[in-house]
């Protein structure tokens, strides 16, 4: 598998997509955390590019973004970090369209997409990008062989959902609940119905928003998901380490253990094949 082959990350069973904020609390720490998450079983890294108005995020990730911005994280520093990642897994850039549009000396997303492709990014998740206005970013991604992952929410209409399924590449991001990101104690009751509405498509389906434990990961894959997306649980772990002044190596060990729990839980949700 090459780093640009995002869909292939789902080929060998349920995929674990792990989100962290680039530069929280430092770029060096983020690189160490990514290595730990991959060691723990992560199949795809969703690396957040900090933006000052993260409308889809809850308090946990908003605070992480502020820490990263206060520490000096910029789009160029983000690309430098991606280029230094050694892990042989796809890296997806999660950010907001304004950053992509304003990068470089001309309006439009093409300049950042080109730079991201050179750095090693495999695709994008842009939650504030309306599907009907996604043409320029889709064209830029297609030109560089990158995926553009659309987010299907519980409130997405059937017509718009089908449009997203036609255009998404790599996988489809299934928003497991209404609202913003943040760890929850229970899987939303709406998740099985959301997945059932997508079973007619072959594109891998990964559920995010609120996943924080191995048991939740099991429930989600048992409901038909091809993967789980986890963010706030990791970011909470990083925040606790920052608050306690723990060295990055200690935080990395905790992240590795959490990823291993989540990966194992996701695998338990899929029935083992029958042996004849």
UniProtKB/Swiss-Prot annotation:
GO annotation terms (biological process): L-tryptophan biosynthetic process
Top enzyme category: lyase
Organism: Halobacterium salinarum (strain ATCC 700922 / JCM 11081 / NRC-1) (Halobacterium halobium)
Reactions it catalyzes: (1S,2R)-1-C-(indol-3-yl)glycerol 3-phosphate + L-serine = D-glyceraldehyde 3-phosphate + L-tryptophan + H2O
Active site: 46 (proton acceptor), 57 (proton acceptor)
Name the record gives this protein: Tryptophan synthase alpha chain
Pathway the protein contributes to: Amino-acid biosynthesis; L-tryptophan biosynthesis; L-tryptophan from chorismate: step 5/5
Function: The alpha subunit is responsible for the aldol cleavage of indoleglycerol phosphate to indole and glyceraldehyde 3-phosphate.
Molecular function (Gene Ontology), one example: tryptophan synthase activity
Keyword tRNA-binding: no
Sorted UniProt keywords: Amino-acid biosynthesis, Aromatic amino acid biosynthesis, Lyase, Tryptophan biosynthesis
EC number, UniProt record: 4.2.1.20
Listed CDD domains: Tryptophan_synthase_alpha (cd04724)
Signal peptide range in chain numbering: none
Entry-linked PROSITE patterns: TRP_SYNTHASE_ALPHA (PS00167)
Any one GO cellular component localisation term in the record: cytosol
Quaternary structure and partners: Tetramer of two alpha and two beta chains.
Family note: Belongs to the TrpA family.
Gene encoding the protein: trpA
